[in-house]
A protein has these predicted regions:
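Large, well-folded core regions of big proteins
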Residues: 38-41
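An alpha-helical repeat/solenoid feature that recognizes helix-turn-helix modules
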Residues: 1-32, 46-79, 92-194, 202-293
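Short, intrinsically disordered, charge-balanced linker/junction segments flanking boundaries
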Residues: 300-301
Length: 301
């Protein structure tokens, strides 16, 4: 009886009040997450999570800058500055952002760093800092272009270092990073993006999903398909003949957000990208999906 009464009382609460409570819970969860990221940053300005400091620092910085803070304003300004300082210090003469001697998958960190630093550049007002970022990103774009394989993808390392091996997840980091640079005013060769788009298409299976690699074809991967579709959207591709098939595949495999979805692995990676895909479909699809996804994430914090 108490449960029934509680349910009825809850249903009697106006929808607006319920929505307001829900949004407050999300905001509180986001703040707790951002505070945790800031608190766990090292004195050198990086994060590691046990490994891959360049990639983890770029991702941590991206989360902080998404809060609205910049290098000079907001509660996370200091942490963002330290992240930028760390990543720019890792820029090498050949343009790579990272350390190939300690990171055997440096392409991830390079791509995530291009994405993060290009967002910082878009908000940066300090003239000297802007000049430094432009130099670092211009070199980074050049490195990425030269690291692309003959097939149009990227591997865990450059084409030269990796004997022309490529695969989907690293390719996606490069395309998003390059797109971020282009949006920030850094010149990006159009042919590099075109080759990358065609690479994604070559990895597409008949069910609409994307396989691991163009050379090592296999079953479709929900995570890579979601990331590839988000990347195509970021590259300005919405109506290509391949996009509807990929969208249908991701909706079938990912839209339910069930616990069983974890069977394909990399759950958080998957929904980082699939949420971008759904957001592009408009409020009617995004709102109910967002509610379910946010509530699940908050419940696991």
């Amino acid at each position: 009886a108490t449960a029934i009464g509680g349910t009825m009382a809850y249903q009697a609460v106006p929808r607006q009040a319920q929505a307001g409570k829900k949004v407050r819970e999300w905001q509180q969860s986001i703040k707790k997450g951002l505070d945790w990221i800031q608190k766990t940053q090292s004195s050198l300005g990086h994060w590691t999570a046990g490994n891959y400091p360049t990639a983890m620092t770029a991702l941590g910085g991206t989360a902080l800058i998404c809060s609205g803070s910049t290098t000079t304003q907001g509660p996370y300004a200091k942490a963002i500055r330290q992240s930028v300082n760390y990543l720019t210090s890792k820029s090498r003469a050949n343009g790579l952002i990272g350390n190939p001697l300690t990171d055997n998958r440096y392409t991830y960190g390079h791509g995530f760093s291009m994405l993060f630093l290009s967002q910082v550049l878009g908000e940066e007002e300090d003239v000297e800092r802007r000049e430094e970022l432009i130099e670092v990103l211009t070199k980074a774009v050049d490195f990425s272009a030269k690291a692309q394989t003959a097939s149009g993808g990227w591997g865990y390392v450059s084409a030269k270092d990796g004997n022309n091996f490529d695969e989907g997840s690293t390719t996606i980091t490069q395309v998003q990073g390059l797109r971020g640079c282009r949006n920030a005013g850094i010149p990006v060769p159009g042919e590099v993006i075109e080759k990358a788009k065609n690479y994604i298409y070559k990895c597409k299976n008949s069910d609409g999903g994307i396989s691991y690699s163009s050379r090592n074809r296999g079953s479709s991967r929900p995570a890579i398909t979601a990331a590839a579709l988000a990347t195509l959207y970021n590259a300005g591709v919405y109506d290509d003949k391949h996009v509807p098939d990929m969208l249908k595949y991701t909706k079938k495999n990912l839209h339910g957000i069930t616990t069983g979805a974890r069977s394909f692995g990399h759950w958080h990676y998957t929904y980082l990208y699939y949420s971008q895909v759904v957001y592009r479909q408009g409020e009617k699809e995004w709102a109910p999906f967002r509610d379910k996804l946010y509530n699940k994430i908050v419940g696991e914090q």
